[in-house]
Structures are given as structure tokens and as C-alpha cells.
């Protein structure tokens, strides 16, 4: 950890944490707030959104950036009984499709789409009067409204083209080994600047550190992918006053 080692004074090490399971999925769940044998519980990002509220009405307050092909990863951003409006929103760093299923259809004018959403909003109000106790309906309405607003705000938030070359190098984006995670952490910093309270940025799909043999070689490879991006993220956050 040659790069991260320079930042240890800005990191808190919690040495009292432990796990009662040797199963990876169970340890993931405990890391995010519950034991696998407990009833389903909201994860920590959902609790933060629920307890602290919203800083930016145009962006989700709990964001997931990474790969989630494994269903166990998806458990890390579920809000459970708090309601789906507090679940994490999965974003892609693909500028053409940053929000899955949230891109405006080609050929549809912005004014036309706005009129469509206003019409749907009126119908939703009628449904809300008819079913006042339907929490799922209210959450769905809010999610659609947020999705509409995010069509403009999310592409801007993940667009790193305006960042300086120095910043890109700080995160290791100029190197193939560190580029993927560097971009994800840079996007996480931009989310934080815009009022997103909690961002999960994963380096890979499930099992990155699950080395059962050749530990030195495989762990060294994994460390190399994240060392400089994490250090760059911490340094960038600190100089911008975002660690205060």
C-alpha cells in the first residue's frame, strides 16, 4: 500500500469489529448492518438517507457504483422495511446510459416528455387519494419523479471530462490497472460535492479478495487496483474540505 500508506492519519481503524461467520456473503451483510440469521434489515446507507433526509432533490441520497451481477451484491443497498425510496440507486459510468432505464427515448422532445410526466403525476394523485395507505405506490411515484429529475443531474455528476489532468492522475485514471476504480471514486467525490449522502463504490463484482491460494500474488494484484485510487480519493476529499 505505498500510496494509501501516506493517508493513514486521515483514516479511522475500527479494531473492535469481528464476525461470527466465515461465509463471504454473511460478512458482506454484517459489514452493511445485519447478521445473515437476523430478520432482513435496512443497510447503513438506507438508514443514513432515512435519518438525515435529502440534500439535493435532483439526486438520490444513496448511490451504488460498481458491478452487481451477483445477487448477493444487491443485498448491500436494499432498504427493506424502510421502503424502496431509501434503497441505493445503481448508477453506471457510461455517459450514454448512466441510469439504467432512465434515459429519455430518442426522438422525444424534452417538452413532450415533461408533459407526459405531468399527466402521469395527475393520475398518480388520483390513485393516492383512492389508496392513501399504499406505501409502495407512494414510493413508486417518488422514484419516477426522481428518475425524471435525474435525467439531467446524473449525467452531469458522473461526467469527469472537466476534471484536470492532475486530478485524473491523482486517482490513477491514466493507468489501465487503476482506471476503473479511479473513475468510480472520482464519481463518488462528485456525488458527495452535489449532496449525495452515501455512496458505495465497489472495485469489482463479488469475490475480488476471495483468494484460496497464491495469496501474495493475488492479493498484491487486488491491492494494486485500489491503492492509488483510494489514496487519491482521500487526498482530493481532504483538500476540498470534504473530510471535515
Q: Where are the language model's segments positioned?
A:
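Ligand-binding pockets and gating/stacking loops
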Residues: 1-244
Amino acid at each position: 500500500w505505498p500510496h494509501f500508506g501516506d493517508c493513514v492519519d486521515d483514516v479511522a481503524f475500527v479494531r473492535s469489529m469481528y464476525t461470527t461467520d466465515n461465509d463471504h456473503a454473511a460478512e458482506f451483510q454484517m459489514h452493511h448492518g445485519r447478521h445473515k440469521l437476523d430478520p432482513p434489515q435496512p443497510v447503513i446507507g438506507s438508514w443514513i438517507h432515512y435519518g438525515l433526509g435529502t440534500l439535493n432533490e435532483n439526486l438520490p441520497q444513496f448511490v451504488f457504483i460498481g458491478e452487481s451481477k451477483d445477487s448477493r451484491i444487491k443485498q448491500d443497498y436494499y432498504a427493506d422495511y424502510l421502503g424502496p425510496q431509501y434503497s441505493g440507486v445503481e448508477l453506471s459510468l457510461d455517459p450514454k446510459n448512466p441510469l439504467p432505464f432512465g434515459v429519455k427515448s430518442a426522438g422525444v422532445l424534452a417538452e413532450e416528455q415533461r408533459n407526459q410526466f405531468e399527466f402521469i403525476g395527475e393520475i398518480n394523485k388520483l390513485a393516492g387519494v383512492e389508496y392513501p395507505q399504499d406505501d409502495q405506490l407512494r414510493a413508486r411515484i417518488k422514484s419516477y419523479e426522481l428518475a425524471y429529475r435525474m435525467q439531467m443531474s446524473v449525467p452531469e455528476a458522473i461526467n469527469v471530462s472537466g476534471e484536470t489532468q492532475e486530478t485524473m492522475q491523482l486517482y490513477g485514471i491514466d493507468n489501465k490497472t487503476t482506471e476503473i476504480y479511479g473513475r468510480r471514486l472520482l464519481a463518488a467525490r462528485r456525488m458527495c460535492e452535489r449532496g449525495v449522502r452515501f455512496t458505495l463504490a465497489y472495485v469489482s463484482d463479488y469475490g475480488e479478495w476471495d483468494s484460496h491460494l497464491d495469496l501474495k500474488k493475488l492479493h498484491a494484484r487486488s491491492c494494486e487496483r485500489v491503492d492509488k485510487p483510494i489514496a487519491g480519493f482521500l487526498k482530493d476529499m481532504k483538500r476540498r474540505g470534504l473530510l471535515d
